[in-house]
From Swiss-Prot:
The gene is hisS. It comes from Trichlorobacter lovleyi (strain ATCC BAA-1151 / DSM 17278 / SZ) (Geobacter lovleyi). This is Histidine--tRNA ligase. InterPro entries: aa-tRNA-synth_II, aa-tRNA-synth_II/BPL/LPL, Anticodon-bd, Anticodon-bd_dom_sf, His-tRNA-ligase, HisRS-like_core, HisRS/HisZ, HisRS_anticodon. The lineage of its organism: Bacteria, Pseudomonadati, Thermodesulfobacteriota, Desulfuromonadia, Geobacterales. One of its GO terms (biological process) is histidyl-tRNA aminoacylation. Belongs to the class-II aminoacyl-tRNA synthetase family. GO terms for molecular function: ATP binding; histidine-tRNA ligase activity. Its main location: cytoplasm. It is found in: Cytoplasm. Its EC number is 6.1.1.21. Keywords: Aminoacyl-tRNA synthetase, ATP-binding, Cytoplasm, Ligase, Nucleotide-binding, Protein biosynthesis. PANTHER family: HISTIDINE--TRNA LIGASE, MITOCHONDRIAL-RELATED, HISTIDYL-TRNA SYNTHETASE. It catalyses: tRNA(His) + L-histidine + ATP = L-histidyl-tRNA(His) + AMP + diphosphate + H(+).
Length: 419
């Protein structure tokens, strides 16, 4: 019996890799315009990192983390998200001392033990960005602007930006009290998890996906109605900056996100095209996280997008790459000459294929068609003696004579086949 992959851990096949490369390359280009540098962190961290950052009472920590004991007896976890690892690296390497503001981005796999479904997998991939060192609402607006522009570069206009404010430690207690009182009157309608968390983390009820909890929390108090003056001004300025930059957004007072470290501004890009998995990107401010992990009081804000979900939205768009030239050869001398020509053209940046199986000319041309090569050329004794051949444009059959020199063929391919 053959060995198959693990449920929820998917292979990325060659037919899909062009789309993923487009997503990653586009993100890198946009991040560069906004002054971000890449950071790469391990996929495995000490379990304590995620318990302290994400929160002990979140679904991620309670139910979804891949945690194991290593041979030294340490509890380790496959990272379920990227922000905690980036902040750990920021503290460990004292990046905050090198520059007052750090702009970092990352790409890579994350792991959560969830029920696999469309847009949700046990190994999934995120592209994220973090800014630390500035608490000004202008930074919030810059991050939101960047996210908006990134999706424009993807060619996606359907995802809608929703924002909320979760306040700060000064104003959240009053809101928590109001929310607990509201939930206490609806105990019977809440799921077991939401009832259990009322004493530790009642905000999780607003993020619960159980239908009964969604219905029971309709009309719940909104955090934006309980903001202190400072948080209210901060949130107002974020909205003013977004309006000034003509970034469309809407308020979603129910948005609390699934991680406990968020403060003040939170946001999601949502779509109705992915069923229950409506968020394709999300993030927010986390002003106390670095200090909570043992570092100095460094404010921060960031976001992450789901690569699989963006790929689903891009759908059937073709990012297939095809060879520039297929060199068909007849005879040993032609095979050697074809190999030399192929190497010279590859050195100039062209994708060139040739026969490696000793097949007939007819079979070689069938392979050129199958590969969807843009051009083909046949090399045999006649062509070698003449020092020239016929370059064929495969799309329409147009043929042009060319000298068997890499520079001449390169110019013909680049110029559309005209020599």
């Amino acid at each position: 019996m053959s060995i198959t992959g693990i449920k929820g851990f998917n292979d990325l096949l060659p037919a899909e890799s062009g789309l993923w490369q487009f997503i990653e390359q586009t993100a890198r280009q946009v991040f560069a315009r906004y002054g971000f540098n890449e950071i790469r962190v391990p996929i495995v961290e000490k379990t304590e990192l995620f318990c302290r950052s994400i929160g002990d009472t979140t679904d991620i920590v309670e139910k979804e983390m891949y945690t194991f004991m290593d041979k030294g007896g340490s509890s380790l976890t496959l990272r379920p998200e990227g922000t905690a690892s980036v902040m750990r690296a920021l503290i460990e390497h004292k990046l905050y001392a090198l520059d007052s503001i750090n702009k970092l981005y990352y790409m890579g796999p994350m792991f959560r033990h969830e029920r696999p479904q469309k847009g949700r997998y046990r190994q999934f991939h995120q592209i994220g960005a973090e800014v630390t060192g500035a608490a000004d609402p202008l930074i919030d607006a810059q991050v939101l602007l960047m996210v908006s522009r990134l999706f424009q570069e993807f060619g996606l206009t359907e995802p809608r930006l929703q924002i909320n404010s979760l306040g700060c430690p000064a104003c959240r207690p009053a809101y928590r009290q109001a929310l607990v009182a509201f939930l206490a009157e609806r105990q019977e309608a809440l799921c077991e998890d939401c009832r259990r968390r009322q004493g530790t983390n009642p905000l999780r009820a607003l993020d619960c996906k159980v239908p009964g909890c969604i219905e029971a929390t309709q009309g719940a108090p909104a955090m934006v109605e309980h903001l202190c003056n400072e948080c209210d001004q901060h949130f107002s300025m974020v909205q003013n900056y977004l309006t000034a930059a003509e970034v469309p957004f809407s308020l979603n007072p129910r948005m609390v996100r699934g991680l406990d470290y968020y403060t003040r501004t939170t946001f999601e890009l949502v779509t109705g095209l992915l069923g229950a998995q409506s968020a394709v990107a999300a993030g927010g401010r986390y002003d106390g996280l670095v200090e909570q992990l043992g570092g100095p009081a460094v404010p921060g804000i960031g976001f992450a997008l789901g690569v699989e979900r963006v790929a689903l939205l891009l759908g059937d768009r073709s990012f297939e790459k095809t060879p520039d030239l297929f060199i068909a050869v007849m005879g040993d001398a032609a095979r050697t000459a074809g190999f030399r020509l192929m190497a010279a053209l590859q050195d100039q940046g062209f994708w060139v294929e040739t026969d490696c199986e000793g097949k007939s000319l007819k079979s070689q041309m069938r392979r050129a068609d199958k590969l969807k090569s843009r051009y083909s050329i046949v090399l045999g004794d006649t062509e070698l003696v003449a020092g020239s051949g016929t370059l064929k444009r495969m799309a329409d059959g147009n043929q042009q004579p060319v000298h068997l020199e890499a520079a001449t063929i390169a110019a013909a391919i680049t110029g559309g086949g005209q020599t």
